[in-house]
């Protein structure tokens, strides 16, 4: 089968590999029908993910059709259309039982697909712990509508959930890339008083204005003053940092009012510093919002009800044999790209 594979630092390659087979009674084999490219794939390409193993097929955002299941799998059957969770998790350890599946302690737990084991930018993928990692797609939900459920949409949903958003709040979201927009959609479900999105890219600002005209937008340079002028208590009640730069990390806590919640959703290429003398007295609560894929069934229900729609984010579609073009487009943010779908 065709796969897109991490060969060495800076190099992915389209190559043939054997079709995966069941290796455990809890596995499933999924025929991939649609996949996407994530910034995390780019981190692997450039050597920023030490756990990533050269020779691994990349890709962790995908949907498909179950082809085969192990003897212990009960939640899905061959022929089911499914989303695939970016995380594999056992469902039995302390963290899984308490809903923190991102911290699963099994050796295959956490982010394995497309990082430590072969992922889904391929014709087929083996999914460990299939009962936890696969969710059936409702009949009237399309593959494109469900494509982002297992990663960036689950990330945004978890981040919004842990941020304690109330209807009287002013919420600031820093960053309007794919994860930032998914976070925005999930924050909108909480119906806060106002939402401000901070973004520098004019194309992404236009996207926000076109699709979500009720949302306020501001550039990073004007953000602090704008938030103070458009909030009730001298700053945002909740800040979600989804951009992942040193400057945006600082901007997040600077724009927060005293006693606010600051949720860090982004990944950073290097460690960040909390300048505690500058922050003293703000009494901020910091949370981290890394993807926790325990809510995928609820997210699919919201999509089926018409309350969540990420299809507009899929701005470009390529076949697998042109995936290198798709990566070039996505990495260089060309032609107004938000998300790219890879189809078979």
Would you name each region that the model predicts?
Residues 1, 226, 250-254, 293-344:
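C-terminal hydrophobic helical "lid"/dimerization subdomain
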Residues 20-35, 48-97, 138-141:
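Glycine-rich beta-strand-centered segment in the early N-terminal region that forms part
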Residues 34, 85, 240-242, 344:
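Short, well-ordered coil/turn residues at beta-beta hairpins
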Residues 79, 168, 214, 235-236, ...:
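Local beta-strand N-terminus motif with an aromatic residue
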Residues 92-174:
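NAD(P)H dinucleotide-binding glycine-rich loop of Rossmann-like/cofactor-binding domains
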Residues 136-221, 225:
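Mid-domain Rossmann-like dinucleotide-binding core that forms the NAD(H)/NADP(H) cofactor-binding site
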Residues 163, 188, 205-285:
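Glycine-rich cofactor phosphate-binding loops and adjacent beta1-alpha1 units
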Residues 199, 266, 290:
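Conserved acidic E/D residue at the C-terminus of a beta-strand in Rossmann-like folds
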């Amino acid at each position: 089968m065709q796969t897109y594979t991490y060969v060495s630092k800076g190099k992915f390659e389209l190559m043939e590999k054997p079709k995966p087979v069941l290796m455990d009674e809890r596995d499933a084999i999924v025929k991939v029908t649609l996949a996407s490219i994530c910034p995390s794939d780019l981190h692997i390409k450039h050597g920023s993910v030490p756990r990533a193993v050269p020779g691994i097929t990349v890709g962790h955002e995908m949907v498909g059709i179950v082809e085969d299941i192990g003897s212990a799998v009960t939640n899905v059957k061959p022929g089911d259309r499914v989303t695939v969770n970016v995380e594999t998790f056992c469902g039995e350890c302390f963290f899984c039982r308490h809903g923190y599946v991102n911290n699963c302690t099994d050796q295959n737990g956490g982010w394995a697909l497309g990082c430590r084991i072969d992922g889904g930018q391929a014709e087929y993928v083996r999914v460990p712990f299939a009962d936890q990692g696969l969710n059936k797609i409702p009949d009237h939900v399309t593959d494109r509508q469900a494509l982002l459920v297992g990663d960036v949409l689950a990330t945004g949903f978890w981040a919004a959930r842990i941020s304690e958003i109330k209807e009287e709040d002013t919420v600031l979201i820093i960053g309007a890339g794919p994860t930032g927009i998914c976070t925005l959609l999930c924050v909108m479900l909480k119906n806060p008083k106002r939402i401000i999105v901070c973004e520098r890219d004019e194309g992404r600002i236009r996207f926000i204005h076109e699709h979500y005209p009720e949302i306020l937008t501001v550039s990073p340079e004007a953000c602090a003053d704008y938030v103070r002028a458009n909030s009730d208590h001298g700053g945002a009640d909740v800040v979600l940092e989804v951009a992942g730069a040193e400057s945006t990390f600082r901007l997040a806590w600077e724009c927060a009012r005293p006693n606010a919640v600051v949720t860090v959703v982004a990944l950073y290429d290097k460690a960040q510093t909390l300048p505690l003398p500058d922050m003293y007295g703000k009494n901020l609560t910091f949370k981290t919002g890394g993807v926790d894929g325990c809510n995928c069934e609820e997210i699919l229900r919201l999509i089926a009800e018409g309350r969540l729609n990420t299809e507009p984010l899929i701005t470009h579609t390529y076949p697998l044999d042109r995936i290198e073009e798709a990566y070039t487009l996505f990495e260089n943010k060309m032609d107004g790209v938000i998300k790219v779908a890879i189809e078979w």
